[in-house]
Amino acid sequence: MSFDLIIKNGTVILENEARVVDVAVKGGKIAAIGQDLGDAKEVMDASGLVVSPGMVDAHTHISEPGRSHWEGYETGTRAAAKGGITTMIEMPLNQLPATVDRASIELKFDAAKGKLTIDAAQLGGLVSYNIDRLHELDEVGVVGFKCFVATCGDRGIDNDFRDVNDWQFFKGAQKLGELGQPVLVHCENALICDELGEEAKREGRVTAHDYVASRPVFTEVEAIRRVLYLAKVAGCRLHVCHISSPEGVEEVTRARQEGQDVTCESCPHYFVLDTDQFEEIGTLAKCSPPIRDLENQKGMWEKLFNGEIDCLVSDHSPCPPEMKAGNIMKAWGGIAGLQSCMDVMFDEAVQKRGMSLPMFGKLMATNAADIFGLQQKGRIAPGKDADFVFIQPNSSYVLTNDDLEYRHKVSPYVGRTIGARITKTILRGDVIYDIEQGFPVAPKGQFILKHQQ
C-alpha cells in the first residue's frame, strides 16, 4: 500500500507507551503504525524528535467577532499552530455578542471563514439570560457549556457574557443534564472576591501580592464545593476550569471517588510562575484565579503527577496593551499563553521533573479529546486524524516578542529560557507550521461539531 506520508525514526507518543516507530498517513488519517510500512509520496525523518499528538487546548478565548482588536482567528490560530496546538475548544466569551444562542454562534462561524489554521470546537454559554435557548446551541453542535459563578462581563454592554447565580446555575445544569452536555465552570466566590477587591482598592493596596490576597484559595474551594453539589443534584456532568490550588483539586478528587462525573483542568502558568514572579512581570501575568505562591505551586505539581488533574489548557485570554496599563487591581485579567503551552510544559514536566511521555500526551491531548467527545482527535492511533507536533528536546531558546504570532506581541513568558522547541505541526496530514518555513499552506482548519463526531 502506498501512503501520502510516512514519519520515520521519531519517538512517538502512543497511548500507553512511547517508542521509536514509523507512522503512515493516508487521506488525512493515521493509516498504520510500525516498521517497514512501505512507500509514501513524502517521507519525514523525525530522528531525535518526539512526535506527540497535536495538543487539544480545551480553553481558548478568541475575541472575534466584536473584539477582534483583542485577538482574532487568523492571529490566534497561527499562534496555536506555532505552539503545537492542532485543535482548540473555543470559549463563548470575550467576543461580542457572547455565544449564547444560534444567531451568535453563526456570527462566529462567519467571522472565522478562511482564517482557521487549526481545527476548532465550540462551547456555548450558560448565562443569566439564555436558559431557554440552551437547546439552540446544542442543536448547532457545541461540545459543552461554560458559565461563571465569579463576576464577569461588562454590565454596560447588553450582549456581553454574564455570570450566573446559584438558581440560574442549578436550572441551567438541569437543562444541560437533559441534553447530555457538560457544564464548565469558572469557580470563585463572586461576592467575597468582589468585596475583597474593592476593599483593597479603597485602601490603596495595588501590588500583585495584594491582588492574589483579594482572591484567596478558600474562594475557589468554596465555589468548587458548591457547584459540585448543585451539578450532582441537577444530574449534570461537571468540568472545573483552570484550578489554581491543590485544595481545589482535592474537592474534585473527593467527588470523583464518591462516583460523581467530574473532570478538571489547570494551566501552565500555575505550574511555572509564582506570586513573586507575578510581581516582577506585572499585569501581563494577571489572571483569575490568580497565580499563587511557591508552596501552592509545589502542591499543584504533586496533584498533576498523581493524576488528579485531567488536562492542561492555555486559558489564552489576551487584550489590547492599554487594558493592561495602570495598577494590577484595575488591569484586565487574562494571560496570552496559547503559543507557549507545549514547549514550556515539555521542558518543565518531562525534562526537569521526569514525567513520562505517555502521561504528557494524555495531559496535553488525549484526555481533553475524550472529555469533550472529539473522537478523531488526541491520539496517535490508526483511524484518527493525522495531527502531530514534533518536539525537539533539550533545545533551549529565549522567547522574544518577535517570536509571537498574537494580535499583540506580549506574553508573561517573553524573556523565559525554554528548554524544548516545537519544530513542526501537522494537521490532518498537512504541515501547518514549520520552524524553517513558517506557515507553508493556506489556513485549512475546520469547525468540529458534536453531531459530526
From Swiss-Prot:
Catalyzes the conversion of allantoin (5-ureidohydantoin) to allantoic acid by hydrolytic cleavage of the five-member hydantoin ring. NCBIfam families: allantoinase, PRK08044.1. The keyword Metal-binding applies. The modification N6-carboxylysine is found at K146. This is Allantoinase. Keywords: Hydrolase, Metal-binding, Purine metabolism, Zinc. Belongs to the metallo-dependent hydrolases superfamily. Allantoinase family. GO terms for biological process: allantoin catabolic process; purine nucleobase catabolic process. It comes from the Bacteria. The keyword Metal-binding applies. Pathway: Nitrogen metabolism; (S)-allantoin degradation; allantoate from (S)-allantoin: step 1/1. InterPro entries: Allantoinase, Allantoinase_bact, Amidohydro-rel, DHOase/Allantoinase_Hydrolase, Metal-dep_hydrolase_composite, Metal_Hydrolase. Pfam families: Amidohydro_1 (PF01979). Binds 2 Zn(2+) ions per subunit. Its cofactor is Zn(2+). The gene is allB. Carboxylation allows a single lysine to coordinate two zinc ions. Homotetramer. It catalyses: (S)-allantoin + H2O = allantoate + H(+). Zn(2+) 1 binds at H59, H61, K146, D315. It comes from Escherichia coli (strain SMS-3-5 / SECEC).
